[in-house]
From Swiss-Prot:
Gene3D superfamilies cross-referenced by the UniProt entry: 3.30.300.20, Ribosomal protein S3, C-terminal domain (3.30.1140.32)
Residue ranges of domain KH type-2 in the record: 38-106
InterPro entries attached to this UniProt entry: KH_dom, KH_dom-like_a/b, KH_dom_type_2, KH_sf_prok-type, Ribosomal_S3_C_sf, Ribosomal_uS3_bac-typ, Ribosomal_uS3_C, Ribosomal_uS3_CS
Quaternary data: Part of the 30S ribosomal subunit. Forms a tight complex with proteins S10 and S14.
Name by which UniProt lists this protein: Small ribosomal subunit protein uS3
Cellular component aspect of the GO annotation: cytosolic small ribosomal subunit
The entry's keywords: Ribonucleoprotein, Ribosomal protein, RNA-binding, rRNA-binding
Family the entry assigns: Belongs to the universal ribosomal protein uS3 family.
Pfam families assigned to the protein according to its UniProt record, in alphabetical order: KH_2 (PF07650), Ribosomal_S3_C (PF00189)
Tagged with keyword Ribosomal protein: yes
The gene coding this protein: rpsC
GO MF annotation terms: mRNA binding; rRNA binding; structural constituent of ribosome
Length: 208
């Protein structure tokens, strides 16, 4: 059975960069765990803001967090009130000086993580999984994607036995290193159980 390597990890240092950028000697594991906790906290708190990615940079006791969001207005809040509250809460929780930078995701239809979350939201609302997948794929292609592949696994449509279904349009060359492929996952927690959603979006080849 063919296994898929993680498309982002496969291209690290070639087309993709790391989401955590810092250097550590003895506290490495502790800081990796802290990064994970920061990401989980931000994604849970700003769930409705469409968080695509959270990048973290560290220097001494300072942590710079860059949040990529489809709805910056929700994150920033009125006169920056929401972002200031978030910064203070993070400082209190992690005992470090926190700087937050907000970046807008201009085309959320081409962000694999946001597409996956959109599909999972539709599955929770009991939209037919094939319709949800096809709608997301056609929207991404309309906004300029060269190819899209979506896979869903679990008790699809409330079926007794779990299964995996996928849908693809265009080409998604997973083994071509110069191919710019965005990959994202999401989990739809339905009344029948969890359904995993994976999305691959091919945006074109980046020539050296």
């Amino acid at each position: 059975m063919g296994q898929k390597v993680h498309p982002t990890g496969f291209r690290l240092g070639i087309l993709k960069s790391w989401d955590s950028r810092w250097f550590a000697t003895k506290d490495y594991a502790k800081l990796v765990h802290e990064d994970r906790k920061i990401r989980d906290y931000i994604k849970a708190r700003l769930y409705h803001a469409g968080i695509a990615k959270v990048e973290i940079e560290r220097a001494a006791n300072k942590v710079k967090i860059r949040i990529f969001t489809a709805r910056p207005g929700i994150v920033i809040g009125k006169k920056g009130a929401e972002i200031e509250t978030l910064r203070r809460d993070l400082e209190r929780k992690f005992k470090r000086e926190i700087l937050i930078d907000i970046q807008e995701v201009r085309r959320p239809e081409l962000d694999a993580t946001l597409v996956g979350e959109n599909i999972s939201l539709q599955l929770v609302r009991r939209v037919a999984f094939r319709r949800a997948m096809k709608r997301a794929v056609s929207a991404a292609l309309k906004f300029g994607a060269k190819g899209v592949r979506v896979a869903s696994a679990g008790r699809l449509g409330g079926a007794e036995m779990a299964r995996r279904e996928w849908y693809r349009e265009g080409r998604v060359p997973l083994h071509t290193l110069r191919a710019d492929i965005d990959y994202g996952t999401a989990i739809a927690r339905t009344t029948y159980g969890a359904i995993g959603v994976k999305v691959w979006i091919f945006k074109g080849e980046v020539l050296p």
